[in-house]
Amino acid sequence: MGLWDWAVAAYGAPGVSDACLALQDNHEQNVPLLLWSAWAAATGRRPDEETLEAACDTARAWDGVVLTPLRAMRRILKAPVPDIDDGPRETIRNRVKALELEAERHLLQALEALAPDPSAPPRPAIDGLAATARIWAAVTPRPALIRLADALPA
């Protein structure tokens, strides 16, 4: 199964979206990057440190230029705005949300292209999540990563 299909299925599992959003909002983690890490672990892929750094660089570029601005706009448009009718505001918000999802899909495609071929048995998701989170940020939010790993489907 490709990364996009795996990520959509995983994100829909109970508890995964909440765990992902907590990592994003409370620990400034990149959800597509985390899902890539968990997918790599689940499919027996072992990205080396250089690949992890390249994945983080790719995610940072998408995050800074595309995802964060789209997410900010979507969140601004969530609440009613004086002098803007709710219908058009919601229409624009839904379009921004669709663009954000499309951008995440493009990021996942770029990350999948960086992943090495499967070379080993699957390993626990927490191993891949922690390895990537260590490169992504100065602080590794281990309890939140464990929560995500525990929620991911086996």
Predicted regions and their residues:
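Long, amphipathic alpha-helical stalk/connector segments used for oligomerization, subunit docking
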Residues: 72-73
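N-terminal interaction modules that seed assembly of large macromolecular complexes
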Residues: 18-60
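Short amphipathic alpha-helical segments and their helix-coil junctions
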Residues: 3-24
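Short, low-complexity, intrinsically disordered N-terminal peptides in bacterial proteins
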Residues: 1-3, 149-154
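Short alpha-helix boundary/capping elements
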Residues: 28-32, 40-45, 63, 100-104, ...
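A charged, amphipathic interaction segment
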Residues: 77-151
